[in-house]
Amino acid sequence: MVKRVHIFDWHKEHAKKVEEFAGWEMPIWYSSIKEEHLAVRNGVGIFDVSHMGEFIFRGKDALEFLQYVTTNDISKPPAISGTYTLVLNERGAVKDETLVFNLGNDTYMMVCDSDAFEKLEAWFNAIKRGIEKFGSIDLEIENKTYDMAMFSVQGPKARDLAKDLFGIDINDLWWFQAKEVELDGIKMLLSRSGYTGENGWEVYFEDKNPYHPNPEKRGRPEKALHVWERILEEGEKYGIKPAGLGARDTLRLEAGYTLYGNETKELQLLSTDIDEVTPLQANLDFAIFWDKEFIGKEALLKQKERGLGRKMVHFKMVDRGIPREGYKVLANGEVIGEVTSGTLSPLLGIGIGIAFVKEEYAKPGLEIEVEIRGKPKRAVTVSPPFYDPKKYGAFREE
């Protein structure tokens, strides 16, 4: 059965394109991908990302459990703040990229990808049952995916909008730090975070979902609809646009961010013989805290010894052409890898992409080719982001 977010009916009425993504029926665009993309880069946009998965971990053993099932050190950040961390399988492959927020009182919230929450729920519960065979564990794992509404407000004007709505300056928060806020009597958690490369914030709160799989939990999403429309109303003076998943993807690609299912996954990578993707291959080793034990650590240490084989690299087109997922990447006439994400950059007007290539080619400044419609087109490897960070992005010069 297709899944739907709390205010799906609003999206159905206002979006020009709604289609299934990762099992969820979601807005792809309202006006156009380019218009929404540029609104975020130059002003402000709002995304409904309530399809993201959320778990609550409660109990005295919650921290120790999360330290074991994720790669980063989540013991350091104080309440209320988050940590970018990975969930790996025993072979070191990425099951998902997640955020874990320390809510205080032995309680943590994990935010994960929309197409990973079901397998993660099964994974976590299986690990918990395995631990219980050898003794008791003070841990409750609750899946809040269908209950939690999540809106993402992104762009250089997102800071001004947060001041107007909540009376706070998000620049006083470090990245992934959170704060409890209230809007018209509705309490929510606000974090300085996003997936666009821009400055921004995201809010989390529970509400009724008319499409909840449990009929007893269904109801009118009065809070979610009010918050969504209130943000749009207050943001009108900044030219706010509702933005769909189409713009969210082009924005994250311009920023050079990975996408679960494309750059990180457990399955085979597209049509090549590349094995499961590890964080070392996907340049995500910054999210690994080596001074602890975690699932997949031993496999990663072995991979470091034998070599990665293939690795992720960013590239931009020199010739005209739009790279797409699955296109071959060549060097000196030899196939060296494959594109995992590609698009025409709405900001730059050129083709950009991410590929997995032989390890020796995974560095910036190399000339490569991308086979587009049977013809090799020139490209060059680069360091992300694709845009000038002095002019665009969260740390642009004001």
Curated annotation (Swiss-Prot):
It is an enzyme of class 2 (transferase). One of its GO terms (cellular component) is glycine cleavage complex. The keyword Disulfide bond does not apply. Pfam families: GCV_T, GCV_T_C. One of its GO terms (biological process) is glycine decarboxylation via glycine cleavage system. It comes from the Archaea. GO terms for molecular function: aminomethyltransferase activity; transaminase activity. InterPro entries: GCS_T (IPR006223), GCS_T_bac (IPR022903), GCST_C (IPR013977), GCV_T_N (IPR006222), GcvT/YgfZ/DmdA (IPR028896), GcvT/YgfZ_C (IPR029043), TrmE/GcvT_dom1 (IPR027266). The keyword Chloroplast does not apply. Its EC number is 2.1.2.10. Keywords: Aminotransferase, Transferase. It catalyses: N(6)-[(R)-S(8)-aminomethyldihydrolipoyl]-L-lysyl-[protein] + (6S)-5,6,7,8-tetrahydrofolate = N(6)-[(R)-dihydrolipoyl]-L-lysyl-[protein] + (6R)-5,10-methylene-5,6,7,8-tetrahydrofolate + NH4(+). Belongs to the GcvT family. PANTHER family: AMINOMETHYLTRANSFERASE, AMINOMETHYLTRANSFERASE, MITOCHONDRIAL. NCBIfam families: gcvT (TIGR00528), PRK00389.1 (NF001567). The glycine cleavage system is composed of four proteins: P, T, L and H. The glycine cleavage system catalyzes the degradation of glycine. This is Probable aminomethyltransferase.
